[in-house]
Amino acid sequence: MDTDLYDEFGNYIGPELDSDEDDDELGRETKDLDEDEDEDEDDVGEHEDDHPGMEVVLHEDKKYYPTAEEVYGPEVETIVQEEDTQPLTEPIIKPVKTKKFTLMEQTLPVTVYEMDFLADLMDNSELIRNVTLCGHLHHGKTCFVDCLIEQTHPEIRKRYDQDLCYTDILFTEQERGVGIKSTPVTVVLPDTKGKSYLFNIMDTPGHVNFSDEVTAGLRISDGVVLFIDAAEGVMLNTERLIKHAVQERLAVTVCINKIDRLILELKLPPTDAYYKLRHIVDEVNGLISMYSTDENLILSPLLGNVCFSSSQYSICFTLGSFAKIYADTFGDINYQEFAKRLWGDIYFNPKTRKFTKKAPSSSSQRSFVEFILEPLYKILAQVVGDVDTSLPRTLDELGIHLTKEELKLNIRPLLRLVCKKFFGEFTGFVDMCVQHIPSPKVGAKPKIEHTYTGGVDSDLGEAMSDCDPDGPLMCHTTKMYSTDDGVQFHAFGRVLSGTIHAGQPVKVLGENYTLEDEEDSQICTVGRLWISVARYHIEVNRVPAGNWVLIEGVDQPIVKTATITEPRGNEEAQIFRPLKFNTTSVIKIAVEPVNPSELPKMLDGLRKVNKSYPSLTTKVEESGEHVILGTGELYLDCVMHDLRKMYSEIDIKVADPVVTFCETVVETSSLKCFAETPNKKNKITMIAEPLEKGLAEDIENEVVQITWNRKKLGEFFQTKYDWDLLAARSIWAFGPDATGPNILVDDTLPSEVDKALLGSVKDSIVQGFQWGTREGPLCDELIRNVKFKILDAVVAQEPLHRGGGQIIPTARRVVYSAFLMATPRLMEPYYFVEVQAPADCVSAVYTVLARRRGHVTQDAPIPGSPLYTIKAFIPAIDSFGFETDLRTHTQGQAFSLSVFHHWQIVPGDPLDKSIVIRPLEPQPAPHLAREFMIKTRRRKGLSEDVSISKFFDDPMLLELAKQDVVLNYPM
């Protein structure tokens, strides 16, 4: 470039140029410049490592950090925010959250038998026993199962220093120290002869609030082992369980547990201990004879259906197993014949070496005392009181050899070790169950007859009665167990026919399924199958008939119980009856989320908790209030814990607990009540009157059933309740369902009413009657103990004018009007309370009960014990906090349990408008009915008083005016 053509500032000062030359020169310069730049770039590329920083980079092009895409890759989405939108309470990166509510084994523990052997036993139904262990609270059921677990799992006790409580798998059960859920355990146990049996054992809660869990276990069992504390004897729940087992038609055996308490705690002489044990057996037999019609159902140690145990010290024996210890020690003894002489008023004469029914001398002891109790007393006394001197010699005589380290153990573990070596395995328990509890093959037929709604004589019924593993699949599930994280459920039940396979398509029939209405059914695919052993599960590919099984993948359509069958080719299959509980859920709480936007989470939690607890009821009131009904305070406390922590994980507000009420009448309707249909073409006339005492309970307990033929039904009511035969044969329905405590009777005369026309609308009238008795007029609660009589009916000739839309609401209205004309009253639930307390605390118990409208019915000492048992009744609405109040007044020495017992009329007239309910003031007794009704109606979003305009037609009101009937109801 010529420098003369440019000044010092680079401006062109030369001659003018032509535009073409200009462009050519500019193009050449640009081309040269581009080539130079390319060469420079290549040069930089070659030498940039040698001379970093020599290149010129503009400020805006400088790159100090790698981009997010270069760091994380193109698949990762990066978001840049200049403002923090997360609250401080929420972490920027949420930690991985794991939910675990159950205590489960991480791997399969070592057992004394092979798992393949267990699986092989499942195919032989004659070697299977399905047993439920039940009993009163803290009578030793769980501890007994621990002994069986120790016997079959040699390494488990080494990992647990304290009480094992192997079947308390929920953390809440461990914390509370009380069983909440029924837990199945499947183990292989040998009998005295060494023959192995597969035992499916259900460990059930002892608290009376959780008796619904016992019901679920009994339904799939063939027999019951009833645990009774030797010191406490027969208690509240013991009696209820005996009645329940007899009603379920199960074989009953007894295990008298904690016999060590008679020796170490009560310090009874051996003879008194025998009397105590005999008293328990006699008391149980008395209860069985009260509830059972089977005269052969007798419990006696001589028959082998009573065993004795002390779970804490690993003691378990029957007369036969103890006699075998003598036979093994001394030889040449027929232990079976020897066992027959070890109970009752039988004495051993050492001179003649024979047993006699008469005492040889005044100092002679009964054979049970001499051969069983005295050796047991000596063993316990030696270990407890004389460890250092004579114990080793005594143990050598018994053939028990302990090391020096074992002899230095503390008293309890040493005593447990000695007893374990002396008594050996729990073969006596196995003998008792094998002999007196039927196998699934033998027990199937009576169970099917009792629980199956279909015909027993059908092909399907015969397959179930034969426990046929090759027959059509029929499985009855009675329990739902949630997974460790509480997200899903597994169904637990018993295979009654056929074989269920993993991955098999099945048809799940719900509780409302019928052959006419198949809506409550769904096709599902079975996931995995397990055999449950409390804290671990054994996965299997198939489970044949007669066994218990835990099923994955079928939980979605199941609410409480279900029937699982094949999806095709089994169309005549019907359901098993839903569980019938021996208690009633009468305690009610209302719940709502603290944050209203979390309502869907709470609803999902309510659905899950409803599956988890068999007798729990959830419903929505007309006001939109979500209500939970349970059996007691502890029950609802556990429900709310699971709802908050396990299933919904939200904060939930709970209203003060209340109770459900019932509505009844105490007189006959003061006049005939009638109602016309909206089209004025039909008219129904009815009256209401109280039922005879005890009839409502007979209907609820299915002593009488509406499905009986008219002749049988008529004979029952005529003989037991002195009904007129015509009226007894004219019963149309029970209400509000087939076991409802109300009756609808057709009391019309053929000369006055067209029976054919009346029969054409029978179903509609029954439906209206059941609707009305389900929600009474006082406070939308169940009507109870009322008989409704149809006295007259005018029915339209044309079918169009007598449809269900006309008849059903009219029948409901006339039910209400007849009810209101019969002096309506409220009924409240009463609890039966059993209190254990020392003698000096009995007066305090009376005081606490009197303050809560309760009254004592029985006050007696427990035989052979320093404690008293006080039995009483208390209104459920006044029972909240009763247990805490009782312990406060007795310095923690009294212990109580309460359970629903009966309904009782609340004092006062609920429709007396002269009563003024003052806020924050306790009401006198005559005002209680009015207070309960008004507050219940307010809670449900109803008007404070009953409006008769809803239930009485204008002609009826005119009739009331003519009769000069005084009404307390607002118009």
From Swiss-Prot:
One of its GO terms (biological process) is mRNA splicing, via spliceosome. It comes from the Eukaryota. There is a cross-link at K63 (Glycyl lysine isopeptide (Lys-Gly) (interchain with G-Cter in SUMO2)). Residues 126-408 form the tr-type G domain. The modification Phosphoserine is found at S19. InterPro entries: EFG_II, EFG_III/V, EFG_V-like, EFTu-like_2, EFTUD2_N, P-loop_NTPase, Ribosomal_Su5_D2-typ_SF, Ribsml_uS5_D2-typ_fold_subgr. GTP binds at residues 135-142, 203-207, 257-260. Residues 1-52 are annotated as: Disordered. Required for pre-mRNA splicing as component of the spliceosome, including pre-catalytic, catalytic and post-catalytic spliceosomal complexes. Component of the U5 snRNP and the U4/U6-U5 tri-snRNP complex, a building block of the spliceosome. As a component of the minor spliceosome, involved in the splicing of U12-type introns in pre-mRNAs. This is 116 kDa U5 small nuclear ribonucleoprotein component. It comes from Mus musculus. The gene is Eftud2.
